């Protein structure tokens, strides 16, 4: 514990990815992807849908559709279905609530930096009892103006509360680490 405390003393703020880091959202994401691909007539037998956990939706759908209109249609179908059903099929990982409480009590600025749109992730964090621990909930935009993890991280870092602060990014995917490095 002391070693961890010494490491954390180098930071003022911590950015967290959400899916796969704080919340196990895989069941809802996978069910929603299955529904969208079925609706759009895409055969996904043999496709490991877990690989789509994390990357932006348009990037994932771009692997199956070349027409931008179809990518947008798939993205819209996904968001509509996920908001109604998939977003409720998630659970906070064990220990996350206590960790956030401890970090908040220690005075860290806590933020999210997720590829999920802010409009989508905020109600999920509220439903799971986590929103209260975050000073800023940062996510992708609904349009393509802030779609990549790098763009999301830059957006979060541009917030006034983080100016001049030493910030640590915590995530579970390569996209999280690339977004922090860029």
Question: How would you label these PLM feature ranges?
Answer:
Residues 2-6:
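A short, basic/flexible loop-to-alpha-helix module at the beginning of a structural domain
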Residues 7-9, 105-108, 159-166:
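Glycine-rich phosphate-binding loop signature in dinucleotide/nucleotide-binding domains
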Residues 7-98, 102, 119-122:
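N-terminal helical cap/lid subdomain that shapes the substrate entry/recognition surface
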Residues 25, 171-172:
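Acidic di-acidic motifs
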Residues 39-43, 68-70, 106, 129-133, ...:
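Short helix-capping segments at alpha-helix termini
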Residues 87-90, 115, 144-145:
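Short, flexible loop segments at the rims of nucleotide/cofactor-binding pockets, characterized by
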Residues 113, 170-171:
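Short beta-strand immediately N-terminal to the catalytic nucleophile in serine-hydrolase-like folds
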Residues 118-168, 174-182:
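Substrate-recognition "cap/lid" segment bordering the active-site pocket of phosphatases
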């Amino acid at each position: 514990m002391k070693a961890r405390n010494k490491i954390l003393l180098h930071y003022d703020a911590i950015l967290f990815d959400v899916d796969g880091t704080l919340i196990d959202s895989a069941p809802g994401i996978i069910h929603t992807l299955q529904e969208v691909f079925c609706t759009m007539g895409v055969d996904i037998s043999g496709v490991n849908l877990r690989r789509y956990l994390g990357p932006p939706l348009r990037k994932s759908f771009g692997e199956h559709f070349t027409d931008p209109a179809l990518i947008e249609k798939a993205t819209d179908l996904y968001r509509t279905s996920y908001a109604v059903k998939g977003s409720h099929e998630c659970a906070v990982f064990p220990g996350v609530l206590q960790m956030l409480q401890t970090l908040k009590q220690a005075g860290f600025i806590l933020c999210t930096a997720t590829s999920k749109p802010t409009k989508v992730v905020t109600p999920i964090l509220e439903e799971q009892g986590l929103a209260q621990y975050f000073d800023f909930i940062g996510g992708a935009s609904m349009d393509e103006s802030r779609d990549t993890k790098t763009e999301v991280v830059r957006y979060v870092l541009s917030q006034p509360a983080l100016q001049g602060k030493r910030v640590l990014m915590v995530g579970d995917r390569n996209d999280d680490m690339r977004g922090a490095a860029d």
